[in-house]
Every structure is written in structure tokens, then in C-alpha cells.
Amino acid sequence: MNTPLKPKHGQKTNQKPKANKPVVKKQQTKQPPTHKVQGEEVAAVKSGLHPRNRHRGQYDFPALIKVVPELQSHVMKNPKGQWTINFADPIAVKLLNKALLALHYGVTYWDIPEGFLCPPIPGRADYIHRVADLLLKENPKLNPSQVTALDIGVGANCIYPIVGVTEYGWSWVGSDVDPVSIQQASLIVQSNSKLQGHIEFRLQKNSQHIFNGIIGANERYTLTTCNPPFHASLADAQQGTQRKLTNLQANQRKKGRLATPTLSHSRLNFGGQKAELWCPGGEAAFIGKMAVESQQFAQQVLWFSTLISKGDNVRGMKKQLEKLGAQSIHVIEMAQGQKISRFIAWSFQNAEQRKLWWQAKC
């Protein structure tokens, strides 16, 4: 496990918070310098990732192939002579994920059922590193035993708990409404000794609830994480997948590639089951419900957090949290190449109460 570095302070707003208003901070990532490597160029340079993210720079395909030999047949050179894979090929993407987890996190078994969400690991890891910064800023001497995290919608892939355990030694609970996801995530943990004893799973039996039915009456969590459903309907989700494929095709043609992915062929890497992709009302409705439920567990959770894919949803979420009585709200942006994403974190406890929380954990 890496020794956490002292996080940098995020940007401060010019205006002081008004009385009885939560402290709202927005942090932006800085673009790192260009990396140069010896020998041949390698595709998929990921700029803007967190300094502790293991996926900064280029994919080391020789090392990845060594841990997952099946990946070799999917590695190719693009017109610029850089090694890459066809990111429209679901098998190639799945094998890349397997190799990344084996090489960088020591996860010897990882798999997902066909049609389930196959997440981009570099971006998922960035979320964990940046929420870790939030904790380290308050408690620079943070001990892994002080952190218990809850991942809402853990999915069959179990990515957030995997990164949280292997990088920081935190304990995790993963919840999901889908029994198949719980079953597969449990198999991943059972098959990797370094994950055993650190992650447990709970089935959410009521799809209308998020924290209710998962957080026990006497339980306390340091933080929660979530990758919420993005779309409002199945049709919306299918249209979103098609847009991704169209954009990928255009990018491939621009780079001189001939591969033309189809919707059915790319179901895995752009895919996901119903609960992973959509819910009535889409992302805005889901995170709004999360905000309301979080108030019920204000004294049992130190920091709540969730990704927000649609930038337009940030303002509404902040206003709702302010009305609910959140004492501190952070919007933290993440960059991977040209893609900008963000997560929002909030606490119903003020600075003094959070300090007492950490003291009680010592």
C-alpha cells in the first residue's frame, strides 16, 4: 500500500460563506507536464490524473501482456506507430481491465458477466484518490483502520472497493439492487486473498431506497461513494450508447483505422444493466433522492459523495444540499485527457464536529 502524500489545497473562492451557509468549495485539477518514455510510443496518454494514480502516463503494454497473455492478440499499432487496442472491442477492453488490475493492484481474478458495465479504471481510481485527499486534509495522520466506506451501486465490477482496499487499506461495504452483481462482486473478493476480510456486500431489496435498508442503526461510515445511473430510460441509454459509438467511429476514421463497431458488438464496454445505466428521472432524480436520504444519516456518515456526470446537475444538487442543512460542500473536478468529470462531497457536520469524529476514531 502506498503511503499517502499530503494533499494540495483546492482553489478557494473569493467570497466568504454567509452565516448559516455551508462552505462550498470547488477544486480543479492541474494538467501535469508531458511524459516522455524510451523506445516506442504508446497510445492512450492520460493527462490530468491524480499524482497518486497508477495510470498516469502511458499503458505499459509489454507488462500488461505479461500478466494477461490473452491481451496480446488485441494489441495493435495505430497509424502513428503507437501501441493501443480497439476500444470499441468489448473483449479487448475487458482484457485490458483484467491486466490493469493484475499489474497495478495485484488482483489475480477479475471478471464480469456479459452485458455488465466495464468501467474505465483510470478514471474510477481518480475518484478514490481525490476523496482520499478530502480525508487526508482533515486528518493528515489518517490510519486505514479509521476508514469504513460504503459504495452505493457497487456493481459486478467492484472497482471502487478494489482500489480503496489495495491503495489505502480501507474497509468497505458494497450495496446493489442486482443479485447477480452482488454474486459476481463477492466471487471477485473470495478469489483474491488481499481483498478478503476488507469488503462485504449487501443487497438493496427496495429499489426506491439508497441508504435505507443498508446502513444499520448503530453503524458509522467515514464516507460513501457512488457512480449514479445516468439516463432516464432504456431508450435514452441506448441512444447514449449509440452516440458513443458514433463518436468513436469518427475518431477512428480520423486516425486512419478501419474498425467499425456496432451497437451489439460494443454492448460490454459501453454497456451495463438497467440499474447501472438508468432510472426514472435519470441522474438528477437519483442524486436528489440520495441528498434527501443522506440527511437521515447525518450523524452516521462523515462525508457523503457521488459522481455527477452532467455538469448542469451540480448547481441544483448544491442548492438542495444547502436547504437540507449540509455544513460543508465540495465540488471536485477530475480530468482525463479532454474529458472533464466531477464528484460532489458533503457533510452535515461542521469542522469542529468532524474533528471530534476523527478523535473518537483514534
UniProtKB/Swiss-Prot annotation:
Name the keywords, alphabetized: Cytoplasm, Methyltransferase, rRNA processing, S-adenosyl-L-methionine, Transferase
- Bias (Basic residues) ranges: 1-11
Q: Which Pfam families match?
A: Methyltransf_10
Its BP terms in the Gene Ontology are: rRNA base methylation
The record's annotation in Gene3D superfamilies points to: Vaccinia Virus protein VP39 (3.40.50.150)
Provide the reaction this enzyme catalyses: adenosine(1618) in 23S rRNA + S-adenosyl-L-methionine = N(6)-methyladenosine(1618) in 23S rRNA + S-adenosyl-L-homocysteine + H(+)
Region Disordered, residue ranges: 1-40
Q: Does the keyword S-adenosyl-L-methionine apply?
A: yes
Enumerate the GO terms in the molecular function aspect: 23S rRNA (adenine(1618)-N(6))-methyltransferase activity
* A GO CC annotation given for this chain: cytoplasm
- Provide the protein's localization: Cytoplasm
SUPFAM superfamilies the UniProt entry points to: S-adenosyl-L-methionine-dependent methyltransferases
Q: What is its EC number?
A: 2.1.1.181
- What's this protein's family per the entry? Belongs to the methyltransferase superfamily. METTL16/RlmF family.
What the protein does?
A: Specifically methylates the adenine in position 1618 of 23S rRNA.
Under which name does UniProt file this protein? Answer: Putative ribosomal RNA large subunit methyltransferase F
Organism field: Vibrio cholerae serotype O1 (strain ATCC 39541 / Classical Ogawa 395 / O395)
